[in-house]
Amino acid sequence: MLSSAKKRYLLAAYELADDISKGVRSKDIADRLCVQRPSASKMIHALCEEGLFDKEYYGKVHFTPEGLRYANRLYTD
């Protein structure tokens, strides 16, 4: 079970993604959640370790198939 903070990050990325395949910038996630970039980076790293995000080095955040299913479920509930 994910913490409420991790769920907020998943939902923010999901809402920001115009095209899921293009990914989302971590800066945009930080701005959406009104957190500092280092805080967002730590949480994104944690979500990568949980297998919900993939992140390019100095690049965009992408959902894994599992992460996308989870975010979609959160969004529709």
Task: Give the label of every model feature segment.
Residues 2-35:
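N-terminal helix-turn-helix DNA-binding core of bacterial DNA-binding proteins
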Residues 18-19, 52, 74:
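Short alpha-helical segment immediately N-terminal to, or the first helix within
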Residues 38:
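Key DNA-contact positions within bacterial/archaeal DNA-binding proteins
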Residues 44-45:
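Short, hydrophobic-biased segments on the C-terminal half of alpha helices
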